[in-house]
Amino acid sequence: WLCHPMTYAEFQRFLLWEVAASLPTPDEWAYLCGGGCRTLFPWGDGLDHKMKLHHFESEEDQGKPYDMEQANFFGLSIAYDPYKRELVDGKTLTTCGGDGGCNVCGGMGPLLGYLPCSPHCKPEVREDNEIHNDYDFFRPVIRVQTSGWRMVIDRAQE
């Protein structure tokens, strides 16, 4: 949806008025990302060295799907690439799920390279408020009212 430069405030207005949706809060995003698990990653507290990870694949793994792109317990494919940041709700531009590849490019290795993809990684609050079209993505949330509703029984149909 984003194909031209846009500030975070402009994007939030667009999302609310054009799509009738909002961004998840950082806590909601972490819950969705973790699939309800309490471990560092949805599959456990570490990385299995047999996993096929984007940016760390070997020659023989070319063309095979990446393990982290598989859907989690909620059926979501989320936080599978440390280069991709997901926008979350905040007063200023706030992201979860990646660091733009800083740890990977910095040579930190797979575990620290993928640590920003953990649901327990602290959200990054950025000062520039400019959405980067190559690295920033969003997951719209349509909120459903869950309180204040009451059931009305139509006695004429009984």
Language-model regions, residue ranges each:
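Functional-site microenvironments in short loops/helix caps that host divalent-cation chemistry
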Residues: 1-107
